[in-house]
């Protein structure tokens, strides 16, 4: 019971009038394994060359978790039906990743007990052209794990859980009108 005399209905309603930059991205693209591994989250912030493609493919995962051990990752993309080649902006993915990492939502994942405190991050992958110019620049949701068997069946099960979590997070986000 409220003893201050103020009712819930007298509280201001906050409405975000900014356009939602992710509203047009209605498809979630299944996980793509990144062949790069990092020795700790701090090392994942700089563009890292691919072991298979060298500097022709660079990935910055930007993991923010508190664990200091090795990690490997997957990219989970967001797509548009009308413009399949368009990806969201990196800065627009950051608030969505914060939502996905919410300690209120992470326990919904079946593999919650094996997760670190922030398995989702706004990641980028860059492809270099033969001319040395930057070609494709893809911003996507990075999902990482610290399991001892990178890309094992258990690891892929976790990536599948992450995909489902992104789909559900997107539906929740849409229901409340974006972030």
UniProtKB/Swiss-Prot annotation:
Pfam families: Herpes_UL55. It is found in: Virion tegument; Host nucleus matrix. GO terms for biological process: viral life cycle. GO terms for cellular component: host cell nuclear matrix; viral tegument. Belongs to the alphaherpesvirinae HHV-1 UL55 family. Keywords: Host nucleus, Virion, Virion tegument. This is Tegument protein UL55 homolog. It comes from the Viruses.
């Amino acid at each position: 019971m409220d003893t201050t005399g103020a009712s819930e209905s007298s509280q201001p309603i906050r409405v975000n009038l900014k356009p939602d930059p992710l509203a047009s991205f209605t498809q979630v693209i299944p996980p793509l394994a990144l062949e790069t591994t990092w020795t700790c989250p701090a090392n994942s912030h700089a563009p890292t060359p691919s072991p298979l493609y060298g500097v022709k493919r660079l990935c910055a995962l930007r993991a923010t978790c508190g664990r200091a051990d090795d990690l490997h990752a997957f990219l989970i993309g967001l797509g548009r039906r009308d413009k399949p080649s368009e990806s969201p902006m990196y800065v627009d993915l950051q608030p969505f990743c914060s939502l996905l990492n919410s300690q209120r939502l992470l326990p919904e994942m079946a593999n919650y007990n094996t997760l670190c405190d922030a398995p989702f991050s706004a990641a980028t992958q860059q492809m270099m052209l033969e001319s040395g110019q930057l070609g494709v620049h893809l911003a996507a949701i990075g999902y990482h794990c610290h399991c001892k068997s990178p890309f094992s069946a258990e690891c892929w099960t976790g990536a599948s859980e992450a995909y489902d979590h992104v789909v559900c997070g997107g539906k929740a986000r849409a229901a409340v009108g974006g972030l």
